[in-house]
Amino acid sequence: EMITHPAMAVHPAVRDVLIIGAGDGGVVRELSHYPEIEHIDLVEIDPLVVEACRQHLPQTAGKLDDPRLHIHYADGLKFVRAKDACYDLIIVDSTDPFGPGEGLFTKEFYGNCYKALREDGIMINQHESPFYEADALAMQRAHKRICQSFPLSRIYQAHIPTYPSGHWLF
């Protein structure tokens, strides 16, 4: 909810959305509440994530059959390189900034996200918890890289009791 609704509340006309990660379907479920959205691209690197969530998390994955949704099993870093001014909203709900998701925390990736957005587009990126030293440092590095590509960049916070520390940044 908190990775989705704040952007929808401040953008006047979201029609085209790119989601990177979030193969569990939670972001799609929340976006499905907005009839003005015409097209959603979901890029998930691992088809097993989507399959397992459809099978075991039906409340979260229940909207993965939305007709506006197009699922692409691909690397989000590579997918966004080929896009130019075609999205109103990009939501990056990736894993941690190491291992397979590491490329989604690079200057190149954020620059390509900026290029993929329309002039009034918004990117939301989950930033981890500020209460754990390693996460806080990773968040600071990621935000610094985001600021190199996005002239306007803000962080917001949410209390999410099911997440580590219960406090999360976006």
Features from the language model and the residues they span:
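The AdoMet/dcAdoMet-binding core of the Class I SAM-like
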Residues: 1-120, 124, 132-139
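Substrate-binding/catalytic lobe of Class I Rossmann-like enzymes that use SAM or dcSAM, i.e.
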Residues: 128-170
